A protein has these predicted regions:
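Preference for long, amphipathic alpha-helical scaffolds in soluble/luminal domains
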Residues: 1-269
Length: 269
């Protein structure tokens, strides 16, 4: 799988398309490569990461509407996590990603890209990856401000019991009750649990329903599999085309699910 994700890499570290091209750009390939455990010193991965930083860390004017910066923070979050896992946390451009996330964080703890004038609630989709990125940055550098910001986002997820409206108690999106792989930037309960686990909050009582849901997703053969909407496809052209075939990803999802089960052992309701 790792070889397939690195196939077609150019001498400059790119893959012949924009880094954010879905899903063959370097940005997305790197997220998957890091999830698969590619060694931090891998030269090909680091070269690809430099092309991502050249793009994402370029100066740009913040888009602020009614005092709230509107940002696709999943971009910075994923890039930040990848670079930290590849041993690049001390790169000044990586610090720039942290500064952008800290600056753009909304009062409720998350981020949002929507331009609606009345938008006041963060997007779970845009807030998931920043948790990962900020936690990885803290692990690499000890930066406490990054960890504090990630914890505020974790509280946002927990306040919604991982997938419910804090106002009505209803499920926000039925798709969030499924496991997706790769999930790219999309939120679901499984990746939400992985995020709060990074923060040491997996045993919080507000995550109890999501933990129980994870148990119910275990199949008779002892595996967990992708069951939700498939965000990728194979092909030669167009958006949403992947470099590899993931199938139901049970060999990747199962160990991740088992890690969550072990970490939550003894948690109450």
């Amino acid at each position: 799988m790792i070889a397939g994700l690195l196939q077609g890499q150019h001498a400059d570290g790119s893959f012949g398309v924009h880094p954010y091209s879905k899903w063959k750009g370097a940005h997305w390939r790197l997220v998957s490569l890091v999830e698969l455990g590619i060694p931090r010193a891998n030269r090909a991965a680091r070269a690809a990461a430099r092309t991502v930083l050249d793009w994402i860390a370029a100066s740009s004017e913040p888009r602020v509407i009614r005092g709230l910066e509107r940002r696709h923070a999943s971009m910075e979050g994923n890039a930040l996590a990848v670079c930290c896992r590849l041993g690049m946390a001390r790169d000044r451009r990586v610090r720039h990603l942290v500064d952008v996330l800290l600056r753009a964080q909304w009062p409720d703890g998350g981020w949002n890209c929507r331009s609606d004038l009345d938008a006041r609630h963060s997007s779970f989709h845009e807030s998931l990856a920043p948790i990962w990125g900020l936690v990885e940055y803290h692990r690499a550098t000890g930066d406490r401000e990054a960890l504090a910001a990630a914890r505020r986002t974790g509280e946002l997820l927990l306040e919604h019991r991982m997938f419910r409206s804090s106002r009505t108690g209803k499920v926000i999106d039925p798709e969030w009750l499924h496991i997706h792989w790769p999930h790219y930037w999309h939120y679901d309960f499984f990746h939400g649990l992985r995020a709060v686990a990074m923060l040491g909050l997996l045993k919080d009582s507000r995550a109890a329903e999501a933990r129980e849901l994870l148990h119910t997703k275990r199949r008779p053969d002892g595996t967990w599999r992708a069951s939700g909407r498939r965000y990728w496809r194979r092909g030669n052209a167009g958006t949403g085309v992947e470099a590899v075939t993931w199938g139901d990803a049970h060999k990747i999802i199962t160990p991740a699910a088992e890690t969550l089960i072990r970490a939550s052992a003894g948690a109450g309701t």
